[in-house]
Amino acid sequence: MQVFIMRHGDAVLDAASDSVRPLTPCGCDESRLMANWLKGQKVDIERVLVSPFLRAEQTLDVVGDCMNLPAQVDVLPELTPCGDVGLVSAYLQALANEEIGSVLVISHLPLVGYLVSELCPGETPPMFTTSAIANVTLDESGKGTFNWQMSPCNLKMAKAI
């Protein structure tokens, strides 16, 4: 199963609580850039898992405007910044056992980095800029292989060359 792990877009710092911080215009733009890039990779997302926090849900909305996503979206409290990475990993393994081919996960720091390490034992948690996406292949036994990571900055630099 292909797992695409995305950190939410850039969000405002000042809000009534962490859970209601909205995306900035830059966060929307960078999430759109990444979604269009992912679409260009011919990725077919079969399931979506998202944090209940506003900025993650807004990131999902932007991604959904750019590429075809399934109607079913699983909103998981385990995907909040201090969520349980073990539970998320177990959930992903259950999806793999259901023969789901690809999953998009939209979450937060530090969980996104820890999730890569949880799925790929021995892998150092990668740094995730806002809107960055990492790809992991999860095999039938539950062992993950870290394939790549892409960020808005990488795409902007490649375009400048």
Describe the residue ranges of each PLM region:
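Glycine-rich phosphate-binding loop signature in dinucleotide/nucleotide-binding domains
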Residues: 41-43, 95-101
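Functional cleft and adjacent loop/helix regions within the main domain
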Residues: 74, 79-82, 92, 144-161
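Active-site-proximal alpha-helix that buttresses catalytic centers in soluble enzyme cores
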Residues: 2-86, 112, 123-129, 161
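Domain-level recognition of soluble alpha/beta enzyme cores
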Residues: 120-155
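Generic beta-sheet signal
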Residues: 3, 99-107, 111
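Short, surface-exposed amphipathic charged segments that create phosphate/polyanion-binding patches used
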Residues: 87-94
